[in-house]
Amino acid sequence: MSIGGALWSGLKAWVTPPDRHALVREAKARAAALLPPGETVVDGHTVEPGERVPHPPKPYRVDAFGIRPTAGDRVLNGAERVELALDRVNPFNAALDAWDRRGEDRSAQWHGGWQSAAGRLAAALRPRTEKKYLSVLLLTGVGLHVVRVQLSSDGKKVAGAVEHACAVARQDITWLRDRKDVRHGTHEIGFADGSWVTVFLPLGGWGTLVEQFPRRLRHTDPMP
């Protein structure tokens, strides 16, 4: 391959966005492989915390993959956050964002202490890390699991570590409410201890997962 061809190939790979659906499929497979032998996955999907679910205080926050962020990681990711902030203050982008969030409920997105089931799930979704990763929500016959799958530095492929982050017994999951009035893919999960937390299921394909939850509620239904 010529130097020009090599440069073009590298540039093309750099600007080509990742195949998100393929990335999710691989992350789900890697996450499922981490479960105890004999525990069968009913369904799963990548998951993110609701936007206004708070970061856990220091005693409840963990270092993802057992690695404390380095100064170099913080500099690189800080640059990405600056770029994102500049993008958001662009008047055109701000108008689009406001339209997308029209009618959004600005109230709290969780309830319960950090030691509650909802608190443990929320903390698992907000670890301390500068690495790129996906959180995978797996529902099995035994419980609900959150597994973190590390991605490559460009976020385009699964690479590196996989770790179990949280588990809740299936009998402790009492309801799930669809909050499509907030954002398509947003759901509230309620637990037997009275706690609940908002999560976001990105991309499509999560319908079969939510069908497995007990007592599914619409956004027009009152909070249990």
Map each language-model feature to its residues.
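Anionic N-terminal interaction surfaces
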Residues: 2-137
